[in-house]
Design a protein with these regions (language model features):
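Short glycine-rich anion-binding loops that position phosphate/pyrophosphate groups of nucleotides
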Residues: 99-101, 162-164, 268-269
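Glycine/GP-enriched mid-protein hinge/lid loop-to-helix segment characteristic of carbohydrate kinases
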Residues: 56-58, 65, 123, 127-235
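Short, acidic, Ser/Thr-enriched surface-loop or helix-capping motifs
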Residues: 48, 104, 170
């Protein structure tokens, strides 16, 4: 108790004498911080030892692959960590969820076309952070959260329908990244041979057909699209059905390799109805 590992819980019911004191595990004894860098935003969250989010912070901060940017986010992360430690427990470390493929030792971004940071190292990103740091592919981080909260998962394909879609593979109850840290890159599966050009240089990738960015019409936002869709507008329903066909084909293709559960997440997934699934 003096070390903070356990804390007093509720008193037990009396059986005639003084009520006995219960003790319980203190999940806030240690915490960890997750960081997501996006083109126009920096997102931070802190979790406790149960994996529950205990603090959040979002900053409108345009991404720049410069030392000045990494020094600035280092200050933001350190201040956030200090606030977390005041309210909760000591911060064990910081994990950066990366939109890109990492080197086998997870210290360098070897394919970072989305953010324009190929070759960026962990040392550079974390240069001003006062805590141990690591990098992980953002889809892999999401898959690890799935495993944390559902210990019954054995084999699964994770499909994350973000603006830049991604995927991950769970095999034997563990995240399976493969020797090159790039297993589960469903976003670069060819759906339409010779189709739309992808940022990776290929044509017809799943990304170019299953990104929610393909749904809105000119000058329409993604939330705006789904708002009109909910009103039953016919043209939006047709666009949605075509998009769902591509998503379904990607899932079918993936399940032909790994015949396990399918976990669908990401920004677009929150708008899907049971009938869509």
């Amino acid at each position: 108790e003096d070390d903070g590992l356990i804390r007093k819980g509720e008193l037990q019911d009396s059986t005639g004498g003084r009520k006995a004191q219960n003790y319980e595990f203190n999940p806030d004894h240690r915490t960890a911080i997750g960081v997501v860098m996006r083109s126009n935003e920096l997102r931070l969250c802190a979790i406790n030892l149960y994996g529950n989010v205990i603090e959040k912070r979002n900053d409108a901060l345009p991404y720049r692959n410069t030392n000045v940017y990494y020094q600035r986010i280092g200050g933001i992360i350190n201040n956030f960590a200090a606030d977390v430690e005041k309210k909760h427990g000591k911060v064990l470390g910081v994990s950066f969820a990366i939109q890109g493929i990492l080197s086998p030792d997870a210290t360098t971004i070897i394919f970072g076309t989305i953010m324009g940071n190929t070759g960026l190292t962990l040392e550079t990103i974390s240069q001003s952070v006062h805590y141990p740091c690591m990098m992980i592919h953002d889809s892999d981080a999401s898959a690890m959260a799935e495993l944390w909260f559902d210990s019954t998962l054995t084999d699964a394909v994770c499909v994350y329908l973000e603006r830049r879609p991604g995927g991950a593979v769970i095999a034997g109850g563990k995240l399976y990244q493969g020797p090159n840290q790039c297993n589960g890159a469903i976003e670069h599966m060819t759906l339409v041979p010779g189709g739309r050009e992808c940022y990776c240089g290929q044509r017809g990738c799943m990304d170019t057909y299953c990104s929610p960015e393909t749904l809105p019409e000119d000058y329409e936002s993604i939330p705006g699209f789904f708002s009109v869709l909910e009103q039953g507008e016919r043209h939006h329903r047709e666009r949605m059905d075509e998009w769902l066909d591509y998503v379904a084909q990607a899932i079918v293709n993936a399940r032909s390799i790994i015949a396990g559960d399918v976990i669908v997440g990401g920004e677009a997934a929150q708008h899907l109805e049971d009938s869509d699934i």
